[in-house]
Regions:
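Positively charged N-terminal leader segments that act as targeting/secretion signals
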Residues: 2-6
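Intrinsic-disorder-associated, low-complexity terminal segments enriched in Asp/Asn/His/Tyr and depleted
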Residues: 9, 19-20
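A periodicity- and composition-biased signal for non-globular, repetitive helical segments
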Residues: 9-10, 45
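Short polar/charged helix/loop
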Residues: 22-148
Length: 148
């Protein structure tokens, strides 16, 4: 239940956040959070479902120390978003793989730590960094039954 609520909350942010921008959609968006294991991959998957190939969408984390969260996979599957093939990566790994921050039109930070890191990494670029405060649902210590 909690993960489903978090997914729907993120879904609403994706719709409202993009629709509240100017009339033209950004060509590329990077979502970021702490570990790239729950919030940012969910946002990436939802945006790809909503906009297909209209917008280049990627995600990254401040660090890469976790695998994609199983509950995030399950909840997104319920709304037709595929996350099981997602591989977590950090900002540094993203750059090493050829996705440089300067190539994005918009960075959406979903946690305070990712906002700080995104601002540090983009201080020399003309790049917008937005902060959408999304609580990390994994920090809620509830049972599997309650989360599902």
């Amino acid at each position: 239940m909690i993960r489903r609520a978090a997914c729907l909350h993120l879904f609403a942010f994706c719709i409202l956040g993009v629709n509240n921008m100017s009339d033209t959609l950004p060509q590329s968006i990077l979502f970021c959070c702490d570990h790239n294991a729950v919030r940012s991959p969910m946002a990436e998957g939802i945006m790809k479902k909503l906009y297909g190939t209209e917008i280049y969408v990627q995600s990254a984390g401040v660090m890469n120390d976790l695998e994609i969260d199983g509950f995030a996979i399950s909840v997104c599957e319920e709304i037709g978003v595929e996350l099981s093939r997602h591989r977590t990566r950090s900002f540094d790994e993203m750059a090493q793989g050829g996705d440089h921050l300067s190539a994005f039109d918009l960075v959406v930070a979903l946690s305070p730590a990712s906002k700080q890191r995104a601002l540090e990494l983009t201080r020399f670029f003309h790049l917008e960094v937005e902060y959408w405060p999304i609580m990390d649902p994994t920090e809620l210590g509830e049972s599997r039954e309650v989360k599902m």
